[in-house]
Swiss-Prot record:
Annotated function: Peptide chain release factor 1 directs the termination of translation in response to the peptide chain termination codons UAG and UAA.
Similarity field: Belongs to the prokaryotic/mitochondrial release factor family.
Localization terms from the record: Cytoplasm
Organism whose genome encodes this protein: Streptococcus pyogenes serotype M18 (strain MGAS8232)
Gene this protein is translated from: prfA
Keywords: Cytoplasm, Methylation, Protein biosynthesis
Disulfide bonds: none
Recorded superkingdom: Bacteria
Protein name, as recorded: Peptide chain release factor 1
HAMAP family: Rel_fac_1
InterPro entries recorded: PCRF, Pep_chain_release_fac_I, Pep_chain_release_fac_I_sf, Prokaryotic/Mito_RF, RF-1
Cited NCBIfam families: prfA, PRK00591.1
Length: 359
């Protein structure tokens, strides 16, 4: 099936979905209605672009016909030639756009995410930088209209982040933040550095799609759940009732501790969300490691320890090592204006996937 047959099939299905979504039997079936609504939303951009493309093709045909009929009318002929030139350029742009829109979709792209940030190499400075990254993602989420909820956090003595786990919810969160997993390196002069020397520290970021219970069911026999008293600063118990939850997935050893909420049930629910995402991600990563060829055609190697980006404060520079992108906009990017970096990563990934399909 060539690209035009594929596009026509997508348009035919889109029209069929429109009819199905107005069918009373479908409307009364909430689950099916939601599934079909999601499918319609996912194909809408492709169908809109395809219809605009067909209009451009018609405009080209009309302009060519006008040029034939414009003999003796130089002004009309010139106008038709200009329209033909513009329409042919638009045709090429639409063809590239449609190729990208037809690329296989990542099934996780529309999902919310679990975001984990940890200070790594560099002690206090690494923890402070982890805090900077947390602020950057929080502000970026605001620009996108997403909800950002810190689920679990651990700070050090200087106010840095030892570890933070957050849920980011909204439209297409995973599609934009999935490229953030990896090691983020910072180069700057620490506040405690009296000689003015630049130090290098690292924080790690992990982005996992939220996993619903219906998508990945963990056998309760594989979980060990401990209930204990939440502790505050200095280690003192802050609750008379045991509300904190420690959850361990026995087969993998993955552990989650949750004490942010005031009730045991809320802590249990949040811990379950995180452990479900981590366990699903653990097995997905094993499967991904077995697909080296596919991984080479996407952004980076997929290695969670891979250094993906450097933030150089003295030079106000951010470098993404996977795509060779360097921007002298560190202050802007850390303030949450990440679109230029993320758009470049998305475009690079799409280009590589197109090349892979064409080979």
């Amino acid at each position: 099936m060539n690209i035009y047959d594929q596009l026509q099939a997508v348009e035919d299905r889109y029209e069929e979905l429109g009819e199905l979504l107005s069918d009373p039997d479908v409307v009364s079936d909430t689950k099916r209605f939601m599934e079909l609504s999601r499918e319609e939303a996912n194909t809408r951009e492709t169908v809109t672009a395809y219809r605009e493309y067909k209009q451009v093709i018609q405009t080209i045909s009309d302009a060519e016909e006008m040029i034939k009929d414009a003999s003796g009318d130089p002004e009309l002929e010139e106008m038709a030639k200009e329209e033909l030139k513009e329409s042919k350029a638009a045709k090429e742009e639409y063809e590239e756009k449609l190729k990208i829109l037809l690329l296989p979709k990542d099934p996780n792209d529309d999902k919310n995410i679990i975001l984990e940030i940890r200070g790594a190499a560099g002690g206090d400075e690494a923890a402070l930088f982890a805090g900077d990254l947390l602020t950057m993602y929080q502000k970026y989420a605001e620009t996108q209209g997403w909800r950002f909820e810190v689920m679990e956090s651990s700070v050090n003595g200087v106010g840095g982040i030892k570890e933070v786990v957050a849920m980011v919810s909204g439209q297409s969160v995973y599609s934009k933040l999935k490229y953030e997993s990896g090691a983020h390196r910072v180069q700057r002069v620490p506040v405690t550095e009296s000689q003015g020397r630049v130090h290098t520290s690292t924080a790690t970021v992990l982005v996992m799609p939220e996993v619903e219970e219906v998508e990945y069911d963990i056998d309760q026999k594989d979980l060990r759940v401990d209930i204990y008293h939440a502790s505050g600063a200095g280690g003192q118990n802050v609750n008379k009732v045991a509300t904190a939850v420690r959850m361990v997935h026995i087969p993998t050893g993955i552990k989650v501790e949750m004490q942010e909420e005031r009730t045991q049930q809320k802590n249990r629910d949040k811990a379950m969300k995180i452990i479900r995402a981590r366990v699903a991600d653990h097995f997905a990563q094993i499967a991904q490691d077995e697909q080296d060829a596919e991984r080479k055609s996407t952004v980076g190697t997929g290695d969670r320890s891979e250094r993906i980006r450097t933030y150089n404060f003295p030079q106000n520079r951010v470098t993404d090592h996977r795509i060779g992108l360097t921007l002298q906009k560190l202050d802007i990017i850390l303030s949450g204006k990440m679109d230029e970096v993320i758009d470049a990563l998305v475009m690079y990934d799409q280009t590589k996937k197109l090349e892979s399909l064409n080979n």
